[in-house]
């Protein structure tokens, strides 16, 4: 994968992660997560520069794994690989946090894993599509 595909895939993935995160966590799951998590640990407003940086980094991670290592270059391939990546990352990160911190109860932890599968699957689809665009004429 060349630098242009990595950059465009990474940016597209980061933007997708950012907006899906807003939709899932701030719109759909806000009251549920506040009721089942440590509300005192949440900031009233997130530090957006760091949030954007985080989502761009996730976009780069998805692009590197799917585009460079797995050779994904289609929407369908990205959706599949992204779902697997989201499930593995969600399980690993959420259960580690559940085991070591008091930030969410088990119900919220399980819901968050499902949310990560959705986020990474759609992001993987976008990244796969964007990477594959260069091959079409």
Protein language model annotation of sequence segments:
Residues 1-137:
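Juxtamembrane/disordered regions of integral membrane proteins
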């Amino acid at each position: 994968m060349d630098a242009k595909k990595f950059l465009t895939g990474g940016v597209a993935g980061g933007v997708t992660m950012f907006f899906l995160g807003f939709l899932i966590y701030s719109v759909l799951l806000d009251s549920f997560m506040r009721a089942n998590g440590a509300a005192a640990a949440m900031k009233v407003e997130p530090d957006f520069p760091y949030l954007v940086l985080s989502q761009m980094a996730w976009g780069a991670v998805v692009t590197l794994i799917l585009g460079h290592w797995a050779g994904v270059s289609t929407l369908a391939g990205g959706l599949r690989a992204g779902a697997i990546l989201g499930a593995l990352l969600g399980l690993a990160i959420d259960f580690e946090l559940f085991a070591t911190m008091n930030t969410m109860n088990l119900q919220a932890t399980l819901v968050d894993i499902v949310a990560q599968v959705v986020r990474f699957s759609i992001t993987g689809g976008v990244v796969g599509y964007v990477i594959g665009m260069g091959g079409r004429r």
